[in-house]
């Protein structure tokens, strides 16, 4: 994965848990000699996996919890790292944004030529819910997609509920997410997001 991803993990950890925690995560991840990640350098996926594994031990969270938190953080992080215009041009509403995720990755590939992006297909239903199909060469990143969806909900001020209804990790052909926009009767958390169902 590109250094941009690993830098985002680093910033998420240092922002929420401090620099000392980041240094403690680097040691079991065998990255003590690495001072920084270069945004446009492609790193082996194993580097990211080691960071997540070390973070689970240090923070006492599951890998899925960390990846979901990271997915939500990623939306804000990329907006502040110079990609706000790319995000803005992808869609003015959450449904429109989800329809154009593959276009976003195609444009991002101009700056990241070794990018191996996932593919998304969004299906809209009459009740305003959506099914988002996620396909990737990489495994284990579906929890990040859940976080991304919640991050996008916050970006568009659109409270939502997300349920993963099919999982490659459990033998399904694809990862599939049910996205339901909030109605006035749904329980809403203080930060504006909905409770997980």
Identify the role of each PLM range.
Residues 1, 43-44, 141:
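Secondary-structure capping and boundary motifs in well-ordered enzyme cores
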Residues 4-12, 50-54:
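A general alpha-helix detector
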Residues 4-5, 115-133, 138, 142, ...:
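Short terminal or interdomain "cap/linker" segment that borders an active site or interface and mediates
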Residues 17-18, 71:
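Glycine-centered helix-coil hinge/cap
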Residues 21-60:
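Long amphipathic alpha-helical segments
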Residues 48-142:
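Amphipathic interaction/junction segments at domain boundaries or subunit interfaces
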């Amino acid at each position: 994965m590109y250094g941009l991803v690993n830098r985002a993990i680093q910033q998420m950890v240092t922002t929420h848990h401090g620099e000392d925690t980041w240094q403690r995560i680097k040691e079991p991840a065998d990255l003590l000699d690495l001072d920084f990640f270069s945004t446009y350098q492609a790193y082996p996926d194993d580097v990211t996996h080691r960071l997540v594994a070390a973070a689970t031990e240090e923070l006492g969270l599951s890998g899925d919890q960390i990846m979901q938190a990271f997915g939500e953080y990623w939306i804000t992080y990329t907006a502040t790292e110079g990609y706000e215009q790319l995000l803005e041009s992808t869609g003015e509403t959450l449904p429109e944004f989800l329809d154009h995720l593959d276009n976003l990755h195609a444009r991002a590939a101009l700056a990241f030529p070794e990018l191996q992006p996932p593919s998304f297909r969004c299906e809209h239903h009459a009740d305003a819910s959506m099914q988002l199909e996620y396909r990737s060469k990489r495994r284990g990143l579906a929890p990040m997609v859940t976080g991304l969806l919640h991050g996008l909900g916050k970006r568009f001020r659109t409270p939502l509920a997300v349920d993963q209804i099919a999982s490659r990790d459990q033998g399904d052909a694809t990862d599939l997410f049910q996205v339901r926009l909030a109605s006035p009767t749904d329980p809403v958390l203080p930060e504006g997001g909905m409770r997980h169902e």
